[in-house]
């Protein structure tokens, strides 16, 4: 199991050091600093073995978090734990920075004592932790409160406490997708996938039982096997929606979702944590709507000049508007000057980033825009050819490129007197660019 | 208020000030002071001097302050054990606190204080906490048992904590169950033999139920524990798999990987015809692909595991090539791993896409990545024959870029392509030769030289090219020197007239001016070959090379199976078994996949961690290789060879003898001149004993004893036992037995190649042993041993080797070498192979000797359950050279007086008492007398084996 946990600043100074196992000596702290943080080379692996001691590290801004062990631990678990720890710290004091860590070191030690016992990760849901790690000293808790805390921390529903009350029961669903693309210069899709998340913010009283439904192909087809009557009705409805069901390659769920039920019936049912959480993640690769197409044209004119022309085309309903569009066109390292002409938006050559950055605030669907640039090059005797990194793109569109649609989210709370109809529900779709690249 | 100010105080007299503050009356001030102490502790300052003052702050109702004091205690208690006792009272009191959070905190902290005296006080509170009404206290106490076990294992056992911990597996609270499972699994790892976890269908059922209810971490503990279980049949395996598959949709990647581990392992037991098997395979792919959208560090762990899974079951991910395409901003470690998997998945169906990608990667910035990409193109050419042509032209394009390391890497892989497809792509040689000057890495130089030598007849200026390399011969690395030597010899054999000088030059450089033994040996062999029999030389040097295999970098199958059992863990990240990086006995239990069963009804209860070796006879594998290695290096290789080898003829060691003799006769022949060249035999030559594979092969028939002799008559032959499991010898499995037939002893070996590559160049050597056993001939394996092939060999043994007394007496330590490595094992030989044919003593002599040997040398044994009469026993023993001298009948008992002689001349006298008339008593009594009483035990064993078979 995890033998110890260290947090360093960018200089390699220790901010937090907590050792759980006897086999980890004080020199382990220095070994990591010397061999990894101060190493001259770029980090070649997130797992490092130094003298039979293994170090796992992750970096958040310029803070290093390292877990150390001498055993054959579950490596995936260690990284998951480190990420979880970052989440917990962020939930308590915001951004993970040297200042925040120094300001909260007592709290961090208290948390580390609670969420990692002898190197075994324990309940690390912030919802539960915040009920008893408060930094307020000991509150005069009543006996009931105490046993409520312990049963929540150890219980089946460790992520939600009882007795939550809202005057207005409300929930927000965000379908956040990032669409990834790698396209060849000729316009051939080399790989494309959407990785999506359904984030839920729930402000619901009691212990509500929720059921979430979407246009998952497997579910729709299963239901389609019902009566012929129903089927025809559904067909009609789907046709009016335009897009039919979608094929989900794979999905994973927050720990509140009953996985065995999903496995047997493919229904998504759960008791949500209070506040914001990520209900599910999913991935699709079929029938993706690619919101933009990038058409590059690069011409080398002699040894000292490069002509670049890039056309972007938007490919969605004209009534919708894409926002925050940014096209990044890489330039060679020996660029001496750039002239840019674009019809829409603003374009600038950023020497520090070796790229031309072209920004457009808004763009409607089914439109086209282009930029052309002349790049002057300094003559070099560098033999190595310029690697021509791909042209990348950022944008945000108000629909889900995978085609996912929320069909329902039903809420049942048998003990309290509010029904599914009383809950106010909001659904929002946002499609963002992930790694959206076109080679040139 | 912020806490960061505590990090900044670094003035003198700080400790003194802190002391005062700690003893302050004001609560706030106290707390501030403790915070400062903790901050100093974190940055590595020694604040142990404040121990009593800090401990004084422990008695407080402020939970935050209490936790800080506890933190201090955990750090410094070990350095101040006496002072730490001061804290015990507070702990014991806290364990009784009405607040469960405080009870848990106390028991949690106490377990972290590694001071013996405190541990004693811990037992009672711990016992109470294990049965506490509050689940939070119980789950903390469960982990505390593991802590205590780490400090004092005996104490935990004596106090019966392990049983209480086992009971917690049936606890109503899932988190208590999970922590108990985690604690027990860790304790069980340090006691591999104990049956602590005692997994049976009932307990498995409990775990599977808890799996649905506990936290993500608890699910990991339970799944990792489940993976150690061995279902009794395929039905049970399937039902566990069905209940584990829902975990594949968990958001936590570690839960997913642990579930994959359980499924991969139990899948071994399912029949491939089963519908469920196919369904399971399909279910595994999507979650594995999803892991690649996790954070980069987890992607890395996932990719290392996918690498194993793809090797074990390629069918799972064969359609998922695209997801492994490298993204421009992937971290380098993710890029390199993805590349590895891409090559593994490359097939005819997707090769076009893969090649396009690889070509793209070859223009990236990171040198390592680019090299690997270029190498990958070569591997594709070798793996997918249809793509070879395109790969070669891609490589040529890359060479045109003139980027130094790209060119070098390309040449290295083109060499491999030439080996795979001989005489197909020679047209590119010209292009390669243009880049000769830019090669500065040994591997690339060696590859280029190999190409020039191999295709010398088609390269007009081959001699010039090679000569240019020869100028700096001594500055080259060994790899290049060896290659250059071979290439020039090849050139000479192809164009003898023009290159005599060159070859003389390289031979003398290699043999006289070099102090590298490998180079020298190779030089001598070539020299001698050329000087004695150029035709043979041509056959040897220009022999057709075996085609290189498609997959050269696969993990050896036995290791792969073991690593599959460790999916998700560090072992799977390092691709090494835990014993390679974990210290001490922890976690080095060898794991293996369950055997495939076809609905077997066997009622055997399998162990938690089954061992890979078959049960029953297993040779003692020598524990410490170091010692033996030293010993083997001191082996007497016969008398030291001095002077020219022509003189060495009467030597004991078969290998030397053969080589010497073989060369002797070869050299006697008239050298068939090539253009009348006269070679002078090298002046001094120390010929290595075991290198003569190609030379000795002509004589191999002589020693081919395997066929023919068989088991005509002769002493009892034990069935073959595995001496060297494939696990320990990189895929070579050796089993064998000893036989004695008409006066000659031999070792019957069965070599099985369980690796993926061809094995050649076998040789065998014994360490010195009690009876001077030594091979009488070299180990003759005619053809290279291809994967999954088995050969049977009979190795004649002599007893004239050097003698050293072994413990046990009949221990034989053996070294076997092949082209891969040298392996060591030891085995026990039955003593009766040493009983000689003329071991019959005459009666008078027997009597006299019996009296002469002192009584204390007599040893008595019983051979149980052996219902034989005197005649039967006598004839059985006689066939193994134990001779009956006389027979008497005393009071209804048959007495046999017997004698035998060992190869080293030791006589053993025996008296065997048989009670034929008494069916209830089938035991035989054996008395042995011998001047060397230490052999008696082994002679008795020989008796027993012979009589019972």
Curated annotation (Swiss-Prot), chain B:
**Subcellular localization:** Golgi apparatus; Cytoplasmic vesicle, Clathrin-coated vesicle membrane
Q: Which residues carry this modification: 3'-nitrotyrosine?
A: 574
For this protein, the record's InterPro entries field holds: AP_beta, AP_complex_bsu_1_2_4, ARM-like, ARM-type_fold, Armadillo, B-adaptin_app_sub_C, Clathrin/coatomer_adapt-like_N, Clathrin_a/b/g-adaptin_app_Ig
Query: Where's it mainly located?
Result: Golgi
Topology in the lipid bilayer is annotated as: Peripheral membrane protein
> Compositional bias (Low complexity) at which positions?
594-611
One GO molecular function term of this record is: clathrin binding
Which family is this sequence assigned to?
Belongs to the adaptor complexes large subunit family.
Instruction: Specify the protein name.
Output: AP-1 complex subunit beta-1
